[in-house]
Amino acid sequence: MWKTDMKRFALVCMLATLGLTASAQVGDYRSEFAIGFSGGINLTAVDFNPSLKEGKLMGKNAGIILRYTCEKYIKAICAIQVEVNYFQQGWKEVEDESSDHFSKTMNYVQIPALARLAWGRERKGAQGYIVLGPQIGFLLSESQEYTGSWMEKERIHTYQYSHNADKSFDYGITLGAGMELSAPKLGHFQIEARYYYGLHDFYDNSSKGYFGRSGHNAITFKVGYLIDLFKSKNPNIR
C-alpha cells in the first residue's frame, strides 16, 4: 500500500513538472513573481477502513502564497505556485437519533507545490484558473471533543478514541479551481475551491494496526490576495 501511494504521489509530481517544462519551451515568455496570503474554511473527513459513520468536520486554513509566472502557451498562462498553510482537518462521528457526536481535529502545516494554468486578463480584469499538484503535511497537534451523551463503549470501533496519530507526516494530491480579479496598483484578489485527497495513512496500516486505511480528504473554500514583487516588461501582457 505504501509503495503504491508513493508511486501515485511521484507520478503527479512528475506530470506537474513535465507540464510546466514543456510549456516553457515555446510560447510568450514572461518572468513575474507575486507574494500574498489566503484564508478560509475546510470541510474534512477521513477515509477509514473499517468505516465509521461520519459527517463533515469544519476547520480553518490560512497561509502564504508564492507564485512565479513563466509563460503564456497558446491561451494558458502557466505558473508555479508554492504555499505554506496552517490547516485544520480530521473527522466527526455522528448519530442518527441525536445531535451527539465525537470529533477529532488535527492541526497541520501543509506545503503544496502546484502547477497553475489560467485563462483571461493578467494585469487588469478577471481570469479563471486551475491548480494541480502534490502536497505534503506535518502534524502539529490534535484534540478531540465529545458532545451530549456520547458513549465510547457503545461503538463498534473504539481504537480511535484512545490513540493519537501514529504518523505525523502526510502527503497527497490537490486539485482546485478559482477566479482572480486584478487591478493596477491594487494587486490580485482570489476566490477558490479545492479538493485534497490524502494518499498516506496517519494510523498504522500494517497487519498489526487496527485500521487498514486512514487517509484525509478535504474540501476547501478560501480567498486570497497577492501583490507583484516584479513584473515582465512585455507589451503583450494585458
Which sequence ranges carry the predicted segments?
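Hydrophobic h-region of N-terminal signal peptides that target proteins for export
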Residues: L15-S23
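Residues on the lipid-exposed face of transmembrane beta-strands in outer-membrane beta-barrel proteins
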Residues: F37-I41, A62-C70, Y86, A113-L117, ...
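Flexible, solvent-exposed loop segments that connect beta-strands
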Residues: V46-K53, Q88-N107, L140-F169, Y203-I219, ...
